[in-house]
């Protein structure tokens, strides 16, 4: 999708079943569902600007059962992008379903998937208490990125470039962040796991899986209103159908008008 001076593409890894064990198992139509699990989709995004090649989160990578970073790299290759071409990886947080693709195992060692990229994350996420498999995954990822000098930490709200704005949200994790990408008077809004699906635009709830459910709900309400008022393009990382859309007012509330990316 062309949007202002940006070219935007979803890089879907597909659908997965996941249970309380936090194990992501790829799911195909016709597969028997695993008892006690939910369906979830995972989709990083590629954004090409006049001066940058950006990734918004990196998917599961090796943290999906039987998978590696091939799905992500194949998705990039489909759009003519090599791993060496990526200039920045913008991370909403470091749960392994968002940051797993940051590294790949090479000769039994975690190695950055994108050798020329800066990996940008809120500083607080390096020590945020996850309390599950994401702790070990986070530490492995951070160690590899820091060793290669590719880890860039930010604090609070600010701008990386004239195009890239970051804002601390908390909510889903203690130091979760969102990104606003600006081009030719337009804005792309990537809410990470604070606004991961279009269904969360139209429903009010506090999720038990959030670090602070009330904060996440407050941010969802604010971001949906912001996107509707500003005409922003919203990207939905965990949606099973609508990966991007414009939010507008409808009778009785808000609605999402899907667009293809």
What is the meaning of each model-derived region?
Residues 2-8, 12-79, 178-192:
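Conserved beta-strand hairpin/beta-sheet module of binuclear metal-dependent hydrolase folds
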Residues 13-15, 58-61, 94, 124-125, ...:
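Active-site metal-binding loops of divalent metal-dependent hydrolases
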Residues 30-36, 107-108, 166-167:
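Short, P/G- and charge-enriched loop/turn segments at secondary-structure junctions
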Residues 54-56, 90, 119, 188-190, ...:
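Residue-level marker for buried hydrophobic side chains located in beta-strands
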Residues 68-120:
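Active-site metal-binding motif and surrounding structural segment of the metallo-beta-lactamase
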Residues 77-78, 85, 104, 113-168, ...:
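Metallo-beta-lactamase
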Residues 89-99, 169-176, 235-241:
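Histidine-centered catalytic micro-motifs
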Residues 185-187, 191-261:
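Cap/insert and terminal regions of metallo-dependent hydrolase folds
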């Amino acid at each position: 999708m062309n949007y202002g001076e940006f070219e935007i593409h979803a890089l879907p890894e597909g659908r997965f079943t996941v249970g309380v064990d936090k194990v992501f198992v790829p799911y195909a139509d016709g597969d028997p569902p695993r008892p006690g699990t939910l369906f979830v989709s995972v989709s990083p995004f590629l954004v090409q600007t006049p001066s940058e090649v950006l990734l918004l989160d990196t998917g599961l990578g090796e943290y999906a059962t039987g998978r590696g970073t091939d799905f992500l790299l194949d998705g990039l290759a489909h759009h003519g992008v090599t791993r060496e071409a990526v200039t920045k990886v913008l991370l909403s947080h470091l749960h392994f379903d968002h940051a797993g693709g940051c590294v790949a195992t090479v000769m039994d060692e975690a190695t950055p998937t994108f050798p020329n990229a800066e990996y940008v994350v809120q500083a607080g996420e390096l020590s945020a208490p996850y309390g599950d498999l994401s702790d070990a995954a986070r530490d492995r990822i951070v160690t590899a990125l820091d060793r290669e000098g590719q880890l860039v930490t930010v604090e609070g709200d600010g701008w990386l470039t004239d195009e890239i704005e970051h804002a601390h949200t908390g909510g889903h994790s203690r130091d979760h962040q969102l990104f606003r990408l600006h081009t030719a008077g337009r804005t792309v809004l990537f809410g990470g796991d604070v606004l991961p699906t279009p269904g969360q635009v139209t429903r009010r709830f506090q999720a038990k899986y959030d670090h602070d459910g009330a904060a996440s709900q407050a941010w969802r309400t604010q971001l949906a209103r912001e996107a509707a008022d500003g005409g922003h393009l919203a990207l939905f990382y965990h949606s099973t159908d609508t990966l991007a859309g414009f939010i507008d007012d409808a009778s009785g509330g808000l609605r999402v008008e899907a667009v293809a990316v």
